[in-house]
UniProtKB/Swiss-Prot annotation:
Organism whose genome encodes this protein: Hydrogenovibrio crunogenus (strain DSM 25203 / XCL-2) (Thiomicrospira crunogena)
Protein known as: Carboxysome shell protein CsoS1C
InterPro entries xrefs: Bact_microcomp_CS, BMC_dom, BMC_shell, CcmK-like_sf, CcmK/CsoS1_BMC
SMART domains for this protein: BMC
Domain notes from UniProt: The tight homohexamer forms a small pore which is positively charged.
Example GO BP: carbon fixation
Annotated BMC domain residues: 8-93
Entry's family note: Belongs to the bacterial microcompartments protein family. CsoS1 subfamily.
Oligomer and partners: Homohexamer with a small central pore.
Gene designation per UniProt: csoS1C
Factors inducing expression: Induced by growth in low levels of dissolved inorganic carbon (at protein level).
Swiss-Prot/TrEMBL keywords: Bacterial microcompartment, Carbon dioxide fixation, Carboxysome
Task performed by this protein: One of shell proteins of the carboxysome, a polyhedral inclusion where RuBisCO (ribulose bisphosphate carboxylase, ccbL-ccbS) is sequestered. Assembles into hexamers which make sheets that form the facets of the polyhedral carboxysome. The shell probably limits the diffusion of CO(2) into and out of the carboxysome.
One Pfam family in the UniProt entry: BMC
Lineage, broadest ranks: Bacteria, Pseudomonadati, Pseudomonadota, Gammaproteobacteria, Thiotrichales
Primary location recorded for the protein, binned into one broad class: other
């Protein structure tokens, strides 16, 4: 990969944690991508983010979306940004975030 996280950004949003885990597992097995974050959006929605080369991210997101659909009605959205603009990078949640419990 050309940078620490790669070039492309792949996103899958799910209803519930189980479809998100299934999608993350399928994405990392399907292609050479790095799982960089998962976000608990609220209301039971979870977003999983991967980075890597464009072709790998495309294959990973397709595999993750297919796996998520096999779990049930969990897939909300799947999207790929081939080359996110540098101004977008600070907005992305690229750490391991978790809900604030304080």
């Amino acid at each position: 990969m050309s940078t620490e996280y790669g070039i492309a950004l792949g996103m899958i949003e799910t209803r519930g944690l189980v479809p998100a885990i299934e999608a993350a597992d399928a994405m990392t097995k399907a292609a050479e991508v790095r799982l960089v974050s998962r976000e608990f959006v609220g209301g039971g929605y979870v977003t999983v983010l991967v980075r890597g080369e464009t072709g790998a991210v495309n294959a990973a997101v397709r595999a993750g979306a297919d796996a998520c659909e096999r779990v049930g009605d969990g897939l909300v959205a799947a999207h790929i940004i081939a080359r996110p603009h540098k101004e977008v990078e600070p907005v992305l949640a690229l750490g391991n975030s978790s809900p604030d419990r304080s």
